[in-house]
Every structure is written in C-alpha cells, then in structure tokens.
C-alpha cells in the first residue's frame, strides 16, 4: 500500500491507498514538537486498529506546511517503514502544468490539492 501524509498547520491527514482505492484515512492534531518515534507509534496504532502493519506499507509520500515536521516524517519512514519518504515541494514533478509567476512560492498543501483535482 501507499501511505500519503498531508501535514497542515492544525491537522495532519493521512491515508493508505491500494492502487486507485482509498483503503483507510485518518487525521490527528498537528503537534509541531512531534518526534519520528511519536509519529511511528501513532501510525502503528492506527494501522493495527484496521488490521494492518508497517509491512503492508510499501511506499509513502508527505506534503507539509510545517517545515520542522518534514524531517520527522521522513525519519519515521526510514526507521519504521524501511524506505525513503519523498517530500512534495519545489521541483517535484506532478504531471500538471503550474501557471503562476513563481512556482517555488506555491505551498505544498495547495499543490497536492490541485493535483488531486486535476
């Protein structure tokens, strides 16, 4: 499955996908001081509630408007999921034309929402 994470200023939304099917989704309050271990423990608990484990997650990606949490999520993925977690941001190819004066100023949250609608 694919784990997708959208870290917002107040809430973090994430879900698991199998192909085009959304398997499960969750959200919790964004805590800026969260560590990779805390994120891993929270994810593990939520996966287990739905009969899933870390081994079921084969890929992941994160979008974050909270810069200090990006390394925590990527570290969590390496430590607990066993793979690198790409971060959506400037330079990530989306397959969608971005027609604004300075694409590097486009927030990751708006980018992923636009791609989802595209």
What do these predicted regions represent?
Residues 2-45:
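Short glycine-rich, Thr/Ser-proximal phosphate-binding strand/loop in the N-terminal lobe
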Residues 28-33, 90-92, 112:
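Short, acidic/turn-prone active-site loops that include or flank metal/cofactor-
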Residues 40, 70-74, 111-114:
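A general structural signal for well-ordered alpha-helical segments in protein cores
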Residues 44-51, 115-118:
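Generic structural signal for well-ordered alpha-helical scaffold segments
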Residues 50-105:
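Short beta-strand-loop/turn "lid" adjacent to the catalytic site in phosphate-handling enzymes
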Residues 102-115:
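A polyampholytic, Gly/Pro-enriched intrinsically disordered region
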């Amino acid at each position: 499955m694919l784990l997708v994470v959208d870290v917002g200023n107040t809430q973090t939304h994430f879900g698991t996908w199998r192909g085009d099917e959304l398997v499960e989704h969750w959200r919790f309050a964004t805590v800026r001081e969260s560590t990779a271990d805390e994120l891993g423990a929270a994810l593990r608990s939520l996966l287990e509630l739905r009969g899933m484990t870390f081994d079921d997650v084969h890929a992941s990606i994160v979008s974050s408007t909270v810069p200090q949490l990006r390394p925590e999520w990527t570290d969590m993925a390496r430590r607990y999921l066993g793979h690198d977690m790409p971060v959506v941001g400037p330079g990530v190819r989306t397959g969608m034309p971005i027609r604004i004066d300075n694409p590097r100023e486009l927030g990751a949250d708006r980018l992923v929402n636009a791609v989802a609608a595209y």
